[in-house]
Amino acid sequence: MRSIWTGSVSFGLINIPIKMFSAVQESSLDMDMLDKKDNANIKFKRVNENTGKEVDFANIVKGYMLNDKYVILDDSDFEAADAIKTKTIDIESFVLEKEIESIYYEQPYYLEPDKGAMNAYGLLRDALQASGKVGVTRFVLRNKESLAILKPYKNVIVLNRIRFEQEIRSTDELNLPPISKKATKEMDMAEKLIDQLTEKFDITGFKDEYTTKLLDIIKKKAKGKVQKTAPKMKVVHKQGDDLMSMLKASLETKKKKSS
């Protein structure tokens, strides 16, 4: 793996040099865009809007439009905005992970101790494990400030980027039913169905089946085999009075599968 960021984790007066690596990889197939006429690859170029000429990457700068005029920024400007956060992951507090709603989670990264940091890294990892808490921190990655938590995962410390509160869109514009705690027959049946389908979560039991099937189609097409037309799926809108019968049928279906 290639590190995407180097810096340090600040834990009180302890400074832990680390390297950061992406913890995830895409499972989807890498598709290329081609010209329909001859299957030639489509290439995208960086061109000058005024001249239409291609611009070398070395000659491209970043700018911010202010009062109808661009202000050009370089690396030193981004660092000057907060030099500490560009190189330091400063733990500001510790919280219980259950206090953080799942909607805030964004991207996980592995942290690896750099030279001479094994003991301090191990101490932080093991202390987090023993406390059952996560560290809340902020740092700058790719010229953007990120909020994140630090938590142990197996034998590594994971930094999981989380979204700021202002990044979460309001639900006010959605047409939603009111929340009800009223006891009804439908609620009782729904809870029974949930109980029937409850099991211990095992991530190894879930695979990207769509990608596997798509790759199978690609291999068959490469051999000249004709693919069957996929059935058209329609969304069926059921009325409220169908809920009870559908819940009963779902429970019976589960019972038959279990027997």
UniProtKB/Swiss-Prot annotation:
GO molecular function: double-stranded DNA binding
Keywords: DNA damage, DNA recombination, DNA repair, DNA-binding
InterPro entries named among the record's database cross-references: Ku70/Ku80_beta-barrel_dom (IPR006164), Prok_Ku (IPR009187), SPOC-like_C_dom_sf (IPR016194)
One GO process term, biological-process aspect: DNA recombination
Purpose of the protein: With LigD forms a non-homologous end joining (NHEJ) DNA repair enzyme, which repairs dsDNA breaks with reduced fidelity. Binds linear dsDNA with 5'- and 3'- overhangs but not closed circular dsDNA nor ssDNA. Recruits and stimulates the ligase activity of LigD.
Subunit comment: Homodimer. Interacts with LigD.
Protein family per UniProt: Belongs to the prokaryotic Ku family.
Name of the protein: Non-homologous end joining protein Ku
Organism lineage string: Bacteria, Pseudomonadati, Bacteroidota, Flavobacteriia, Flavobacteriales
